[in-house]
Amino acid sequence: MERFRLASDYEPRGDQPRAIAELSEGIVRGDRDQVLLGVTGSGKTFTMANVIAAVNRPALVLAPNKTLAAQLYGEFRELFPDNAVEYFVSYYDYYQPEAYIPTTDTFIEKDSSINDEIDKLRHAATRSLLTRRDVIIVASVSCIYGIGSPAEYQAMHIFFHQGDEYGRDELLRKLVDIQYERNDLDFHRGTFRVRGDIVEIFPAHEGERAYRIEFFGDTVDAISEIDPLRGVVVQRLTKCAVYPASHYVATRETLDRAMEEIRTDLRERLQWFRERNMLVEAQRLEQRTMFDLEMMEEMGFCQGIENYSRYFDGRTPGEPPYTLLDYFPRDFILFVDESHITVSQVGGMYRGDRSRKETLVNYGFRLPAALDNRPLTFGEFTERLNQSVYVSATPADYELQQSGGVVVEQVIRPTGLLDPVIEVRPATEQVDDLLHEVRETTARGERVLVTTLTKRMAEDLTDYYRDLGVRVRYLHSDIDTIQRMQIIRDLRMGEFDVLVGINLLREGLDIPEVSLVAILDADKEGFLRSARSLIQTCGRAARNVNGRVIMYADTVTGSMQSCLDETARRRALQEAFNTEHGITPQTVKKGLRTILESIEERDYYTVAAVAETREEYISADEIPKRVKKLRKEMLDAAKKLEFERAADLRDQIKKLEEMELRLR
């Protein structure tokens, strides 16, 4: 059996050896849920890697967004170069789900842009799970959405050895059945080309290698792995497996059965509409469904085939879909990174998806079976788990309840770094006081993070400091991930010194050059100033030996006191350990590398070098265009359950509409 081989020049240090031993023993013992409370910079990823290597079982690492997933993917690939480390996130660069708005009788057609690189990585992930056990999949919550039956996916793959009796034409038919496209001119992933008795296949899970199958009559004469660009042979093979180009594939028998069930359900639904005199809905449903059936009959596929997945999977109404979790063997281990965020994300996906699809079904755009093309409910998700390890610096109540309150602590950092010193100062003159601290800190070549409560405050503070000569930028929710990564890289390289943000300076911001974190209006109780948020924000200063935090507040709230107490407790443990072992704290040394540069996404945000265009400078003629753009962004944000951003956009729209009335 394949084993995980951990490749690292480092040995576990600090609290890591104890945490690795306790978690590994818990898994072997059969503990269903465990919690790893690991402070920022304590090497939680390295601990997870050691646990995986120790228990030698397939693992799913669940991250709260694509950015952190990409970071973890890069780190695990470095730690396990000889094993299958895969990446499974949503493959959409842009996604507009189909929707119907009854009040305006507006149907919005599905529109999307698929990232080919991520699609390749998704196929590589499912292929690895079906062919080996030394697999680590790093995923976002995309893993709870339906992707088709693993049994059908496995059954439809093509496997042959050199010397097999296998006709060339038979191979071509099978390739078409599993959604490969013949293209003799543009050879790319998911296509094949034919040159006499030679068939070349570009597998869906590959980006740089293709297969060449040479026939002699009806015999497989030779199999080679080739460079698809140059056409040269890389290596000779004795066997070869080609997996489907889509996760939604089915045998001809399954397809015929599914189409018959669709026709039966269509007849019943049409009768239901007609009995209620809903003739427009009946005509609409019949036209759309019959078109899809014709496409399935001819091509074995249709646009939006995922809405019929229940029929292909043989599921009953209401039964959960097959997801990535069903591709794992039963004994897999789940690691939930930043669990205080990720767990709640899993729970929220089902409800938003359901309400949109119910409208489509009620107005005749989809059969009721479309409701079963959905993410898992939270209960269905937990039913599919074997053993879980929740990883966070601030575990939430759910995780603690699941583990019975038992927590494996990882408070001591391998670098000997202490939690930052926290100082509370009055908020009355916070801007000018912070300016003095910023100048002192940047004079030493160190960086500063500043977190505010509102976008306007972030903008105004940035403008004010920039006018005074401070090299400053700010993070806000209109900036996409690629820009965000570039901004953080620029901060680390010293292109600027101060980064201002709102709720974006918490999890996953790994910047060792930052020695000062300033929290403005720290005494304003709420989501952004909860104890958990404050601890996470303070953690951004924990990778620098000079790390410190200034909370600007006129009173010490309960959340602030909890943060102060927890930080003091951790510092006491860390100082005692360093004294006992003669350790001198050292700032984390981290290279400026970019992970997974080809991947684009929209889960996190970056910063513009200048503030956005203010409403005051918009002419009356420009306002309608601006309102239309903002309204679309607001609806998109609401669909993604980003209600804080949607509310902010709503307020901007209201201001612009009021301004238009004044100007006209």
Curated annotation (Swiss-Prot):
Record keywords, A-Z: ATP-binding, Cytoplasm, DNA damage, DNA excision, DNA repair, Excision nuclease, Nucleotide-binding, SOS response
Motif (Beta-hairpin): 91-114
InterPro entries, per the entry: Helicase/UvrB_N, Helicase_ATP-bd, Helicase_C-like, P-loop_NTPase, UVR_dom, UVR_dom_sf, UvrB, UvrB_inter
One of the record's GO molecular function terms: ATP binding
Boundaries of every Helicase C-terminal domain copy: 430-596
GO cellular component terms listed in the entry, alphabetical order: cytoplasm; excinuclease repair complex
Coiled-coil stretches noted in the UniProt entry, renumbered to this chain: none
Gene Ontology BP annotations: nucleotide-excision repair, DNA damage recognition; SOS response
Positions that bind ATP: G38, V39, T40, G41, S42, G43, K44, T45
A Pfam family reported for this protein in Swiss-Prot or TrEMBL: UVR
Location(s) in or outside the cell: Cytoplasm
Chief place of localization: cytoplasm
Domain UVR: 624-659
Domain Helicase ATP-binding positions: 25-414
UniProt-listed NCBIfam families: PRK05298.1, uvrb
Family classification: Belongs to the UvrB family.
Physiological role: The UvrABC repair system catalyzes the recognition and processing of DNA lesions. A damage recognition complex composed of 2 UvrA and 2 UvrB subunits scans DNA for abnormalities. Upon binding of the UvrA(2)B(2) complex to a putative damaged site, the DNA wraps around one UvrB monomer. DNA wrap is dependent on ATP binding by UvrB and probably causes local melting of the DNA helix, facilitating insertion of UvrB beta-hairpin between the DNA strands. Then UvrB probes one DNA strand for the presence of a lesion.
Oligomeric and partner information: Forms a heterotetramer with UvrA during the search for lesions. Interacts with UvrC in an incision complex.
Domains (record comment): The beta-hairpin motif is involved in DNA binding.
UniProt name for this protein: UvrABC system protein B
The organism of origin for this protein: Geobacter sulfurreducens (strain ATCC 51573 / DSM 12127 / PCA)
The encoding gene: uvrB
